């Protein structure tokens, strides 16, 4: 305000009316003229935020900045995002496939031990559903607990057995022999089916199942589905179920190959998996 009025009044009069010391006025004037030292960092933060469609919070943006050779404390990134008004978007009814004991129930071999030192030692699988436009779409997926990477998936309009067996077939194609693998699921009817269990037996895969009604026994894939829905389903508008399906396929590719994870040292799951396999 003082700067605007200086053309009409002397600085001494303006400072006297404002009861502002001359030294304080010049200090603030100097600060205003200073270049914003975070200008380029802000531009990168905005770019990263929009490249990832608002899915990255300050911690993941901090990691991606490091990948771009920009080193800022995560609290600084958080503060800059607040100033820029960049807010990471927050996290549907879970699909229930349990229909009682319609086949053989496997023991809970995983027992909530989600850690593994190598790929292809512990996989988890589940089915989730999406209800849009009066229609339902089902996603069946397998994750490897080593890197949380998406090993295989199928998308279907009905929760049929082939949705799960086709997914398993695709996963088995990339599985080395003698892997000593555990594949964990809930007690859904598909996983109790003789055909599914025979496929596991023929490949030497140990079957593991959660206890009845205990979603925490399969928490990693439950969390994956939560991330998927919060970053895709709740963030975008879709024109049709076919449009949603296209975006779902694109998101699954994004999750595996471009979405970085802090616990993977800032790498996407598929890249982390490949590095581990190459080092073995």
What are these regions (language model features)?
Residues 201-205, 227-280:
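C-terminal domain-tail junction helix/linker
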Residues 116-151, 157-159:
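An active-site-proximal beta-strand-loop segment
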Residues 13-32, 51-53, 59, 242-266:
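K/E-rich alpha-helical interaction surfaces of small helical-bundle regulatory domains
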Residues 1-8, 46-51:
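Short, amphipathic alpha-helical "recognition" segments used to contact nucleic acids or chromatin
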Residues 99-101, 185-187, 193-194, 207-229, ...:
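RNase H-like two-metal-ion nuclease catalytic core shared by retroviral integrases
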Residues 154-176:
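Active-site beta-loop-alpha junctions of metal-dependent nucleic acid enzymes
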Residues 14-15, 25, 45, 61, ...:
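Mobile genetic element proteins and their domesticated derivatives, centered on retroelements
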Residues 23-118, 214, 270-277:
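Basic, flexible linker segments flanking DNA-binding modules
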């Amino acid at each position: 305000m003082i700067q605007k009025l200086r053309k009409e009044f002397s600085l001494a009069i303006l400072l006297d009316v404002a009861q502002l010391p001359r030294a304080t006025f010049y200090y603030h004037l100097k600060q205003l003229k200073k270049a914003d030292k975070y200008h380029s960092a802000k531009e990168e933060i905005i770019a990263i935020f929009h490249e990832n469609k608002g899915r990255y919070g300050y911690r993941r943006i901090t990691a991606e900045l490091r990948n771009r050779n920009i080193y800022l404390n995560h609290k600084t990134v958080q503060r800059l995002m607040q100033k820029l008004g960049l807010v990471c978007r927050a996290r549907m009814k879970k699909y229930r496939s349990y229909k009682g004991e319609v086949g053989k129930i496997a023991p809970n071999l995983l027992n909530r031990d989600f850690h593994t030192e190598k790929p292809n030692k512990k996989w988890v699988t589940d089915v989730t559903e999406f209800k849009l436009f009066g229609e339902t779409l089902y996603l069946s997926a397998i994750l490897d607990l080593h890197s949380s990477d998406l090993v295989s998936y199928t998308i279907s309009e009905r929760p049929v057995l082939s949705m799960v067996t086709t997914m398993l077939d695709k996963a088995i194609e990339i599985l080395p022999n003698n892997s000593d693998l555990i594949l964990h699921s809930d007690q859904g009817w598909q996983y109790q089916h003789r055909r599914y269990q025979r496929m596991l037996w023929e490949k030497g895969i140990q079957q593991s199942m959660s206890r009845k009604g205990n979603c925490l026994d399969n928490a990693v894939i439950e969390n994956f589905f939560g991330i998927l829905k919060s970053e895709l389903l709740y963030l975008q508008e879709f024109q049709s179920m076919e449009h949603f399906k296209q975006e779902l396929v694109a998101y699954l590719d994004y999750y595996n190959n471009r979405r970085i994870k802090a616990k993977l040292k800032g790498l996407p799951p598929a890249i982390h998996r490949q590095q581990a396999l190459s080092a073995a």
